[in-house]
């Protein structure tokens, strides 16, 4: 096992399932999923148990009693439950592209952390995304997104940029390195 993917959840079964679908089609399977559950109801546990039996990726469910917003505490417990020495953090409502884990693993360096971006979709598009859209990766295609309501914008270029165009856009629109919970690893 090369990495542990850690994300939190709280009574958000619809989003949790979409995220799990995204991890089910990763280009590498050499990782475990650790779901840091900040006191969700039984429905969340049942969904996780279902996918533990359906997927060929280990899923560890770390749960704590609901004592208000205790995300940092449950994330710390999830880190302790990890069986690897490389941790990838994301959010419980961020659907990963199929190369998410592989990209983190390919770019890791000892003594460094990686910080990636994310693209926040309007709620109506997020709710519209189906299992098939995630498994086929259509939900990451700019044309599909605009056909389903995403407004045209210059920032949409980052969604489909490859090779030279991606490097150029990163140069033109740099961001400061920061540790964030939606796309970071160390």
Language-model regions, residue ranges each:
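Short beta-strand/loop segment that forms part of the nucleotide-sugar
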Residues: 30-39, 60-64
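Acidic helix N-cap motif at the loop->helix transition within catalytic regions
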Residues: 17, 42-50, 99
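A conserved acidic beta->alpha catalytic loop
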Residues: 22, 37-46, 68, 94
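Short, acidic, metal-binding catalytic loop of nucleotide-sugar glycosyltransferases
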Residues: 21-30
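Short aromatic/hydrophobic "clamp" motif used to bind/position activated sugar donors
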Residues: 87
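Glycine-rich, basic loop-to-helix element that forms the pyrophosphate-binding segment
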Residues: 65-82, 99
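A recurrent flexible, glycine/aromatic-enriched loop bordering the glycosyltransferase active site
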Residues: 146-159, 164-186
């Amino acid at each position: 096992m090369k990495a542990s993917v850690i994300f939190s959840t709280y009574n958000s079964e619809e989003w949790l399932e979409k995220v799990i679908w995204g991890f089910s089609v990763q280009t590498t399977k050499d990782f475990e999923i650790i779901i840091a559950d900040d006191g969700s109801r039984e429905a969340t546990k049942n969904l996780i148990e279902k996918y533990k039996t359906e997927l060929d990726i280990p899923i560890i469910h770390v749960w704590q009693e609901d004592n208000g917003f205790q995300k940092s505490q449950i994330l710390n417990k999830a880190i302790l439950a990890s069986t690897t020495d490389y941790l990838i953090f994301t959010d419980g409502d961020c659907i990963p592209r199929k190369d998410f884990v592989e990209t983190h693993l390919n770019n890791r360096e000892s003594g460094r952390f990686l910080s990636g971006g994310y693209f926040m979709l309007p709620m109506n598009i997020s709710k519209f995304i189906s299992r098939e859209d995630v498994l086929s990766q259509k939900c990451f295609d700019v044309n599909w997104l605009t056909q389903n309501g995403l407004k045209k914008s210059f920032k949409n270029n980052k969604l489909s940029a490859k090779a030279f165009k991606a490097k150029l856009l990163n140069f033109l629109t740099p961001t400061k390195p920061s540790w964030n919970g939606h796309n970071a690893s160390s």
